[in-house]
Amino acid sequence: CGNLNERGHKSEDYRNMEAALNEAIRVAQRQESMDQTLQVLLEFVGKNLEAGRAYIFEKDDHDHDHNTYEWVAKGVLPEKDTLQDLPPEIFAEWYRKFDENQSIVTENLEEMKDVDPKMYEVLVRQNIHSLVVVPLYDDGKVIGFYGVDNPSTRYFEFVSEMLQIMGHFIVSSLKQRNLVRELEVMSYSDPLTTLGNRYAMERYIEQVDHTEPI
């Protein structure tokens, strides 16, 4: 009977999380900019999983990683400014797993100490004892990752699945943000750029996400 009750609570937690996820996407779609959209999504992820921190990392053209978005719980120190332009060797083990379509699920950080000492040193400094990180894919290519630190043990078993579901919307938002930035740097007063502007606008319209609730 105890196991049945526990499974019932888990099922209810999952349904509640799905409903909250749909609401987060609806709220995110109403934001004025993609930056705001991404912040809303991270806030949802962090608060609903009772995590200390939620974040997005993006890979640049030199394979360096940058923490581009971050949400932190009350009392947790922000880390974004200290996590910029990180060399490839820092996340090498993670990207190897991402290339194999695997996520990073660590319930006890001490398990990482001998397996991935470089990453362990980065994480232990931030007072992290557990984390779940999933890759972000664009056309099959890993463009970065996002995840949460110290999520509630109550939700741990389905954190990865929830992050993967939300990941599709995050990638779509990142792509829309990039296209908006392209448009902003183009000069609309130069007739030579008219064709390029029209092409960029068409790409933006194609990328606008009409995500339906899950």
Which stretches of residues belong to each language-model region?
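Short hydrophobic/glycine-rich mini-motifs in sensory/regulatory modules
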Residues: 136-146
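Signal-transmission linkers at sensory-effector interfaces
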Residues: 1-36, 183
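A short, aliphatic-rich beta-strand micro-motif
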Residues: 129-137
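Amphipathic alpha-helical "output/dimerization" segments
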Residues: 138, 150, 154-173
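GAF sensory/regulatory domain recognition
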Residues: 43, 55-89
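Active-site-proximal structural segments of metal-dependent nucleotidyl cyclase/transferase enzymes
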Residues: 202-214
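Regulatory sensory and allosteric helical modules in signal-transduction proteins
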Residues: 76-114, 121
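Conserved nucleotide-binding and Mg2+-coordinating catalytic segments in signaling enzymes
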Residues: 26, 184-203
